[in-house]
């Protein structure tokens, strides 16, 4: 079959989000053809180029979300009126929907229908006129948004929006709705695929929704991170009006995608709960765990005895959400009971905030653990080391996990813990905080403690450091669990089955091929019966009965006219 793979800031770009699993999916399903429709996020991402594409990728079409030239489309009076009506309806839903995730079901359904009608109305207008880039950037759009914010019934945060807030929201909506103006939805584009697979939420689902609306192509939505949750986590400093209105848009778009999709997949139960909260039908939901290549970790997983029994390892991106401060304080408690224990922090900072956090952690480690020397002529050595993968000591991620007997995860916010799965594939016992999908991933093969609790973290680490046999049992069980649930093979097989399920239930009805010739078996044969099943004729109903039973009934008495006085 032919799959339309829809991505935002992802595959096939080298620095794309979720690039790795999309690349593995395309390579693993070589029996299918893929048409990739990619939305880029920046000029630098486009300049970095694409990853090598396999032969089953037939074509790639791209469009930028970070830049859009004015389409120079001048709307006529009737088109301007239609745009104003649709955009006003969209804005009214957002201003009334902000913060109403707990609204009654009937009200929520009504608002969802209003959002869908406005969205598809804008899409149809863009298709007829050639684009809405100029209209969405216009002063009229900002004024329409302002009227919706000031209208009776608008949420408090929307009513408090000021001019800078309105401009920020209008600019975001213009960028988010740019897929409406693309020419991807004709019969030679997404209309020619058998299935659209959106690799994330947000803008990536819009082409899939429009392909379904215009041509009836079924839609599959995959989310390893729910976009609404990401919005809440990444915009804590935004003005309340901006944060509320953008959250309303993300929530409404997600709800419409879940409603129209044939199947919605989540990477873990944590993301699945968010999807249900945003309106996804539980019958449509599937959990497909991310697939990871187990081969690089095979050597470490098959030789756990090579690890240093007195070394703890932390691996990940250095940022405040990882809570390395609590880990360092927990390590101070561990050193009181196990003075020879060492901690290796392996990871690179993420952005300026991560770099500043790394400097803070280095300073805290130097304060908690002054360099210790075994003798007057031996240089001091700090029990905490900060390293990065790619150096001479740790050239590969597997080398980092192989260096220690216990792997620690100290996060306060976590989605799907990739580093935890890598530690499990390496056959290492783990101590983790109870956040995100940690419990779902770890099962009963590791120790789990509350977040922001250095004492509990220290006690769990000490318990494993003191018991080599327990470490070995947990490590072996963790590796077996990871090989069963989190490999590339299971991920590819799961999506292959979902593809077949969707196409069997919702096939695209095409009766002509590309050359205009009839397609064999495009329409199933239909049986024609010579009578109605629901209302059998009397002769059929009494075929085995007496002949007189089929005659018309005879009146007992003839009709007698009423006398003149009775009329």
Task: Pin down the residues of each PLM region.
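Conserved donor-binding/catalytic core segment of Leloir-type glycosyltransferases
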Residues: 301-335, 342-349
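Conserved acidic donor-binding segment of nucleotide-sugar-dependent glycosyltransferases
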Residues: 447-454, 463-469
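Aromatic "clamp/platform" in nucleotide-sugar-dependent glycosyltransferases that forms part
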Residues: 412
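Short acidic/histidine- and often glycine-rich active-site loop of Leloir-type glycosyltransferases
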Residues: 435-448
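A short, well-ordered alpha-helix in the C-terminal region of glycosyltransferases
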Residues: 456, 470-485, 491-501, 511-514
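Nucleotide-activated donor-binding/catalytic signature segment of Leloir-type glycosyltransferases, i.e.
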Residues: 358-392
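Short hydrophobic beta-strand element within catalytic cores of glycosyltransferases
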Residues: 429-432
């Amino acid at each position: 079959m032919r799959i339309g793979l829809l991505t935002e800031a992802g595959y096939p770009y080298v620095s794309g989000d979720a690039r790795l699993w999309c690349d593995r999916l395309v390579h693993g399903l070589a029996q299918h053809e893929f048409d990739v429709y990619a939305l880029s996020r920046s000029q630098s991402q486009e300049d970095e180029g694409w990853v090598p594409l396999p032969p089953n990728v037939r074509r790639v079409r791209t469009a930028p979300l970070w830049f859009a030239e004015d389409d120079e489309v001048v709307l006529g009076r009737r088109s301007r009126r239609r745009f104003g009506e649709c955009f006003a309806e969209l804005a009214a839903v957002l201003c009334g929907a902000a913060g109403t995730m707990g609204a009654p079901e009937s009200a929520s359904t009504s608002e969802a229908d209003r959002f869908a009608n406005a969205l598809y109305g804008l899409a149809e207008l863009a298709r007829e006129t050639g684009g809405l880039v100029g209209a969405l950037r216009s002063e009229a759009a900002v004024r329409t948004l302002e009227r919706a914010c000031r209208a009776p019934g608008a949420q408090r945060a929307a009513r408090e929006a000021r001019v800078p807030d309105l401009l920020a929201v209008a600019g975001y909506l213009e960028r988010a709705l740019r897929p409406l103006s693309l020419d991807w939805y004709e019969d030679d584009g997404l209309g020619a695929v058998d299935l659209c697979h959106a690799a994330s939420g947000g803008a990536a689902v819009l082409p899939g929704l429009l392909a379904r609306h215009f041509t009836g192509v079924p839609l599959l939505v995959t989310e390893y991170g729910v976009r609404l949750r990401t919005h809440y986590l990444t915009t804590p400093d935004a003005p309340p009006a901006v944060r509320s209105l953008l959250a309303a848009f993300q929530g409404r778009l997600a709800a419409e995608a879940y409603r129209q999709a044939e199947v919605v997949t989540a990477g873990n139960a944590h993301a699945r709960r968010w999807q249900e909260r945003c309106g996804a039908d539980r019958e449509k939901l599937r959990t497909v765990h991310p697939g990871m290549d187990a081969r690089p970790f095979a050597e470490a997983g098959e030789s756990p005895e090579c690890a240093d029994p007195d070394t703890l390892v932390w691996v990940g991106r250095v940022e405040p959400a990882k809570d390395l401060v609590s880990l360092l304080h927990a390590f101070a408690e561990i050193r009181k009971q196990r003075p020879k224990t060492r901690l290796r922090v392996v990871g690179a900072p993420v952005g300026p905030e991560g770099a500043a956090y790394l400097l803070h952690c280095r300073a805290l480690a130097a304060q908690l653990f002054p360099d210790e020397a075994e003798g007057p002529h031996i240089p001091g050595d700090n029990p905490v080391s900060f390293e990065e993968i790619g150096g001479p000591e740790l050239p590969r991620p597997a080398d980092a996990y192989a260096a220690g007997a216990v792997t620690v995860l100290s996060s306060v916010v976590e989605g799907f813990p990739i580093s935890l799965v890598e530690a499990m594939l390496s056959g290492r016992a783990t101590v983790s905080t109870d956040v995100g999908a940690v419990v779902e991933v770890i099962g009963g093969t590791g120790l789990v403690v509350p977040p922001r609790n250095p004492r509990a973290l220290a006690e769990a680490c000490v318990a494993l450091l003191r018991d080599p046999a327990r470490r070995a049992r947990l490590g072996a069980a963790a590796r077996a669990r990871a090989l069963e649930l989190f490999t590339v093979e299971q991920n590819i097989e799961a999506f292959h089955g979902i593809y077949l399920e969707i196409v069997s239930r919702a096939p695209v009805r095409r009766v002509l091929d590309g050359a205009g010739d009839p397609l064999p078996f495009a329409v199933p044969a239909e049986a024609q019966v010579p009578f109605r099943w629901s209302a059998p004729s009397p002769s059929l109903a009494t075929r085995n009965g007496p002949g007189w039973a089929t005659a018309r009934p005879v009146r007992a008495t003839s009709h007698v006219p009423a006398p003149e006085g009775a009329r």
